[in-house]
Regions:
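Short active-site oxyanion
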Residues: 23-27, 49-52, 167-172, 223-229
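SAM-dependent nucleic-acid methyltransferase catalytic core
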Residues: 1-15, 70-193, 197-203
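S-adenosyl-L-methionine
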Residues: 1-32, 36-37
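Short His-Asn-centered micro-motif
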Residues: 30-31, 55-56, 174-176, 194-196, ...
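Short, solvent-exposed loop/turn segments at secondary-structure junctions
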Residues: 10, 34-37, 58-60, 122-125, ...
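Conserved beta-strand scaffold positions in the cores of enzyme catalytic domains, especially
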Residues: 52-54, 172-173, 247-252
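Long, positively charged, glycine-interspersed low-complexity recognition regions
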Residues: 207, 211-278
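SAM cofactor-binding core of SAM-dependent methyltransferases
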Residues: 23-98, 143
Length: 278
């Protein structure tokens, strides 16, 4: 998507995808963010998939995805948007984070969605968009040798049939607490990919009041469900108590922490844990 988000799984989504059962009928991400794991799916192999649920507690994320469902209108409205423009970038940030407004989930706001995409696509990967600065030349050079900014790359996906397939597959967009969305969609044929704010990194996220009691509430909701889940975390001691390795499948993978990345310096390594009830 070319949109950066705190804790996003753009780098390891393919690894996670390999553990998702392909006989599911409903796919849900209770903490969808930029929905990277879904975008890594090879959807044609999921023959029984009928329902795809995007859910996030952050109204800015939800509004963005409501607007992306009408990708043609989104693309048309961005045609005159200048790229890597510091003045516009700072204005978008101010309009989003220094100005009070209310988003109506029944009436998507394309102006806000475009400003949000403009900021997310042009901050350093994993940076809090409220605090991030414009990254000049943060895009990529294509095979033709022509440079494209990340906002241009994002915009190009709005007219790409490959991406239309993903946008069209999203059937439900919710702005619910994770426990509500789990209860609403849980069934024996539902799969939940859960990527919550990680333990002791919760303050990086917008609109997340996520203390240890909330982590435990999530654990209890997952353990009580009928469906299948995969849960991403960094390791902390309570995970061993909540999800003992004798009862749950654990996998791990080393990766570069984009949220701690600094231009010009080697990226910090971390170990991603994936816990499954199957």
């Amino acid at each position: 998507m070319a949109l950066s988000y705190i804790g996003g799984k753009s780098k390891i989504g393919t690894w996670i995808r390999n553990y998702i059962p392909n006989n599911i009928e409903t796919y849900v991400e209770p903490f969808s963010g930029m929905f990277w794991v879904f975008f890594k799916l090879n959807t044609p192999i999921f023959k029984n998939l009928k329902t795809v649920v995007y859910n996030d507690v952050n109204p800015l994320n939800v509004n963005l995805y409501l607007c992306l469902k009408d990708y043609k209108k989104f693309w048309e409205m961005t045609q005159n948007t200048p790229i890597e423009n510091k003045e516009l970038f700072n204005k978008c940030k101010s309009d989003l984070f220094d100005t009070e407004f209310v988003l109506d989930m029944n009436n998507p706001n394309f102006d806000i969605a475009i400003k949000y995409a403009y900021v997310l696509s042009q901050v350093w990967s994993g940076t809090d968009p409220k605090k991030g600065n414009l990254i000049l030349k943060g895009g990529y050079e294509g095979k033709d040798g022509v440079y494209k900014s990340k906002f241009e790359i994002f915009r190009s996906k709005l007219i790409d049939p490959k991406w239309h397939r993903y946008f069209d597959a999203i059937t439900n967009i919710e702005n619910l607490d994770f426990e509500e969305v789990i209860k609403k969609y849980d069934s024996p044929t539902t799969y939940f990919y859960c990527d919550p704010p990680y333990f002791k990194t919760e303050d990086y996220y917008i609109n997340h009041d996520f203390g240890i009691q909330t982590h435990e509430r999530l654990a209890n909701a997952l353990k009580a469900m009928e469906g299948r889940f995969s849960l991403s975390y960094y390791h902390f001691d309570l995970l061993d108590k909540w999800f003992p390795v004798t009862e749950y499948t654990w996998k791990d993978k080393e990766f570069a922490k984009t949220a701690m990345a600094v231009p010009g310096k080697a990226q910090t390594k971390g170990t991603e844990i994936l816990i499954m009830n199957y």
